[in-house]
């Protein structure tokens, strides 16, 4: 219920009131029975048009323009064509299609195990890497000019036909050997 209310732009105050069963109406955050002065400011919860990267809706894309076809090239050189949606990130897309792209930090920008090489024709279509991504790429083995982290590449219509090649090796710095399950 809260999610559907949030999509409609329900104020935070109303959601808190519903959850607590009281109306917050007095300065200082004390509750009352509906008497007193209501808070003068409200904040609205609103859903954006995008969805979290990597999530897949059961209904599939709504418009043909939402589909982005890309190719993964695995460590053995096998080409794996997949279809994603605008807003997906490359790490989650690869995992969803069984491509062996690790993502040890679960897309939190704390490792370089989702390191990929981006096809030269599409590299300039990506925004430049932020400093945190560059820091993680510095730890990636076999770094090249077209290296990026898959968790930081978000599919756009311009990436139609892009190729993401997995390097021959990756380095997982997790001490305890934890390997997360793909989302």
From Swiss-Prot:
Q: How is the cofactor bound?
A: Binds 1 [2Fe-2S] cluster.
Ranges annotated as spanning the membrane: none
For this record, the Gene Ontology CC terms, alphabetical, are: iron-sulfur cluster assembly complex; mitochondrial matrix; mitochondrion
Provide the tissue specificity: Widely expressed, with highest levels in testis, kidney and brain (at protein level). Expressed in muscle (at protein level). Expressed in fibroblasts (at protein level).
The similarity annotation says: Belongs to the adrenodoxin/putidaredoxin family.
What is the name listed in the Swiss-Prot or TrEMBL entry for this protein?
Ferredoxin-2, mitochondrial
Q: Which InterPro entries match?
A: 2Fe-2S_ferredoxin-like_sf, 2Fe-2S_ferredoxin-type, Adrenodoxin-like, Adrenodoxin_Fe-S_BS, Beta-grasp_dom_sf
Q: What Gene3D superfamilies would the database entry show?
A: 3.10.20.30
């Amino acid at each position: 219920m809260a999610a559907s209310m949030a999509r409609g732009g329900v104020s935070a105050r109303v959601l808190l009131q519903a959850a607590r069963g009281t109306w917050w109406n007095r300065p200082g955050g004390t509750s009352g029975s509906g008497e007193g002065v209501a808070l003068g400011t409200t904040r609205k919860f609103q859903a954006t048009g995008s969805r979290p990267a990597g999530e897949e809706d059961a209904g599939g894309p709504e418009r043909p323009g939402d589909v982005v076809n890309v190719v993964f090239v695995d460590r053995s050189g096998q080409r794996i064509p997949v279809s994603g949606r605008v807003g997906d990130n490359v790490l989650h897309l690869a995992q969803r299609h069984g491509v062996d792209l690790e993502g040890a930090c679960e897309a939190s920008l704390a490792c370089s195990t989702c390191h990929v090489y981006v096809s030269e024709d599409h590299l300039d279509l990506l925004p430049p890497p932020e400093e945190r991504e560059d820091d993680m790429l510095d730890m990636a083995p076999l770094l090249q000019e077209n290296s990026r982290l898959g968790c930081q590449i978000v599919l756009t219509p311009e990436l139609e036909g892009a190729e993401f090649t997995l390097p021959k090796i990756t380095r997982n710095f997790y001490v305890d050997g934890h390997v997360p399950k793909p989302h």
